[in-house]
Curated annotation (Swiss-Prot):
This is Acetylglutamate kinase. The keyword Magnesium does not apply. Belongs to the acetylglutamate kinase family. ArgB subfamily. The keyword Electron transport does not apply. It catalyses: N-acetyl-L-glutamate + ATP = N-acetyl-L-glutamyl 5-phosphate + ADP. It comes from the Bacteria. The record marks K9, K218 as: Transition state stabilizer. Pathway: Amino-acid biosynthesis; L-arginine biosynthesis; N(2)-acetyl-L-ornithine from L-glutamate: step 2/4. Keywords: Amino-acid biosynthesis, Arginine biosynthesis, ATP-binding, Cytoplasm, Kinase, Nucleotide-binding, Transferase. It comes from Aliivibrio fischeri (strain ATCC 700601 / ES114) (Vibrio fischeri).
Length: 260
């Protein structure tokens, strides 16, 4: 049995679908009872941020799928991701008999955070840090739910792309990684699922504008993870929670990204 921890990145509109979250956490609960494998959830919550920005009448700007985060907005975004989104997921976990703890990338020095690009504002780049605290939590059989908010060594709050954050967490733990999103995986020009993809094939599809916008970030994060971890990384959909048990035991249900 594979005892390597599994990092599950949750993103997209899944946070707005209570029915899907119920099925997801029931699947996780059933799986953990059988497999005794450590699961870690890393999440974003872009739709919550979009809703908040609209209410505050603040403009949302994205560059290559990354949210531009002015310093005067990082407090709002931290509240939406590390607050509302994180506690909502923790609540759904508890409701479905999954013991959970809400964390951020900064807790216990789990990830090192630097500013990605000054033009993007308070957008951070996460790299693997010290996983000792997270490993101690996992030893208690509690499921960590980690928001994609990080803190630099200078104490600056940073909004980290959740896919990239999940890569850093998986690297810190030497864990397997699954990126769950709104889409079933990477689709070709005919909208058919691509079962397997390497870096050269992905760059060609980006050049051909088959892979666009936020999917570019997701694809590059998955390829980086595959390279860094030295094993295939999966991108799949959360829309079919009944298939996730297959994924947890190592069967592919989406697109697998291969290391070079």
């Amino acid at each position: 049995m594979n005892q390597r921890p599994l990092v599950i990145k949750l993103g997209g509109a899944v946070l707005s679908s209570i029915d899907t979250l119920t099925l997801l956490f029931k699947t996780i609960s059933n799986y953990q009872q059988q497999a005794k494998r450590s699961l870690i959830i890393v999440h974003g919550g872009g739709y919550l941020v979009d809703e908040l920005m609209a209410k505050l009448q603040l403009e949302t700007i994205k560059k290559e799928g990354l949210r531009v985060t002015p310093k005067d907005q990082i407090g709002y975004i931290t509240g939406a991701l590390a607050g509302t989104a994180n506690k909502m997921l923790q609540g759904q976990a508890m409701k479905n008999n999954v013991k959970a703890i809400g964390l951020s990338l900064a807790d216990g020095g789990l990830c090192q955070i630097t500013q990605l690009n000054p033009e993007l504002g308070n957008v951070g780049l996460a790299t693997a840090g010290d996983a000792k605290v997270l490993e101690a939590i996992l030893a208690t059989q509690v499921t960590p739910i980690i928001s994609s908010i990080g803190i630099t060594n200078d104490g600056e709050l940073m909004n980290v792309n959740a896919d990239q954050a999940a890569v850093a967490v998986a690297t810190a733990l030497d864990a397997d990684l699954v990126l769950l999103s709104d889409v079933p995986g990477v689709l070709d020009a005919e909208k058919q699922l691509i079962k397997s993809l390497d870096s050269a094939q992905a760059e060609m599809l980006i050049h051909q504008a088959v892979i666009t916008d936020g999917m570019i970030v997701k694809v590059r994060a998955a390829l980086d993870a595959a390279q860094e971890l030295g094993r295939a990384i999966e991108v799949a959909s959360w829309r079919s929670p009944e298939k996730l048990a297959e994924l947890f035991i190592g069967n592919s249900i989406g697109t697998q990204f291969q290391p070079q």
